[in-house]
Design a protein with these regions (language model features):
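Basic, Lys/Arg-enriched C-terminal extension of HTH/homeodomain DNA-binding domains
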Residues: 188-215
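Active-site beta3 strand of CheY-like receiver
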Residues: 53-59
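Non-catalytic signal-transmission and effector/linker regions of two-component phosphorelay proteins
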Residues: 1-14, 20, 141, 207-215
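Receiver (REC) domain active-site loop signature in two-component systems and cognate sites
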Residues: 62-64
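C-terminal output helix
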Residues: 93-95, 109, 113-122, 168, ...
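Acidic catalytic/metal-coordinating carboxylates
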Residues: 41-42, 68-71
Length: 215
C-alpha cells in the first residue's frame, strides 16, 4: 500500500476519462489500496472543480470529447499548475503520447492496461507529487519570509545577491557600514538564515520558482 507523508494531507488521484467504465474500474482499483480518488468525464469538468490544496496526480485519457487530454495538459502548463500526469492511450496514439512526454507527462499507458502496472505507476507518480508539494510548501514559507522584509532590507538583500560587499552597499545607498551590518543582522533573523550563502540560495530559489503553483 502507498505510504503517505504524515506531514502532508492525503494525496488525491484525479481520473479524467469520458468512458465511465474506465472511471469506475480505476476507482475500484484505487479503493483497493485505500487511495483517495475523484473522477471526471471531461477536462472542463475537472477545470471547474475546486481542488483541495494537497498533493495530487492525474490519470488522463489522451483522446476525449471536447477538450482533449493533450489540450488539458497544455492549459495546466500555461497556468503553471504542477501536477504529474499519467496518460491513458489507445492503439495508434503513440505519436500523441510522445508529444505528451515531451510536455512533461510522467508516463503513458496503453489501454487495456495491466491493473498492477497501473497501480505501480500511480504510486510512483504520487511519490513525485508529494515531494513536489512539500518543496512547494517550503518555498511558500520562504517567500512569506522574504515579503516580511522592509523596503530598505529588500534593497540590501538584492545587492547582496548581486555580490556586493557591505562596504560597497553602504557607498551605493549612502549609509554607514554599521547601518548595513545592522540591516544584514535583521535580514538573517527574519529569514532564519545563518549566512549570506543561505540568503542568496533562498532568494535565487524563490525567483526561479515564484510562478509555479500546485493546484
Amino acid at each position: 500500500m502507498y505510504m503517505t507523508n504524515p506531514h502532508v494531507a492525503e494525496p488525491i488521484v484525479y481520473v479524467i476519462d469520458d468512458d465511465q467504465d474506465i472511471c469506475n474500474s480505476l476507482t475500484w482499483l484505487l479503493d483497493s489500496v485505500q487511495l483517495e480518488s475523484k473522477t471526471f468525464n471531461s477536462a472542463t469538468e475537472f477545470l471547474n472543480y475546486q481542488r483541495p490544496h494537497t498533493a495530487a496526480c492525474l490519470i488522463l485519457d489522451i483522446r476525449m470529447r471536447g477538450m482533449s487530454g493533450l489540450q488539458l495538459q497544455q492549459q495546466l502548463n500555461q497556468q503553471k499548475i504542477n501536477m504529474p500526469i499519467i496518460f491513458m492511450t489507445g492503439h495508434g496514439d503513440i505519436p500523441m503520447s510522445v508529444n505528451a512526454m515531451k510536455a512533461g507527462a510522467f508516463d503513458f499507458l496503453e489501454k487495456p492496461f495491466n491493473p498492477q502496472h497501473m497501480l505501480n505507476q500511480i504510486q510512483s507518480c504520487l511519490q513525485k507529487a508529494e515531494l513536489d508539494f512539500v518543496e512547494y510548501e517550503k518555498r511558500n514559507l520562504q517567500l512569506s519570509k522574504l515579503k516580511s522584509l522592509s523596503p530598505r532590507e529588500n534593497e540590501i538583500i538584492n545587492l547582496l545577491v548581486d555580490g556586493l560587499s557591505s562596504k560597497h552597499i553602504a557607498q551605493m545607498l549612502n549609509i554607514s557600514h554599521k547601518t548595513v551590518e545592522i540591516h544584514r543582522t535583521h535580514i538573517r533573523q527574519k529569514l532564519g538564515t545563518e549566512s549570506i550563502a543561505q540568503i542568496v540560495n533562498m532568494v535565487l530559489m524563490c525567483r526561479e520558482k515564484t510562478l509555479q503553483v500546485m493546484v
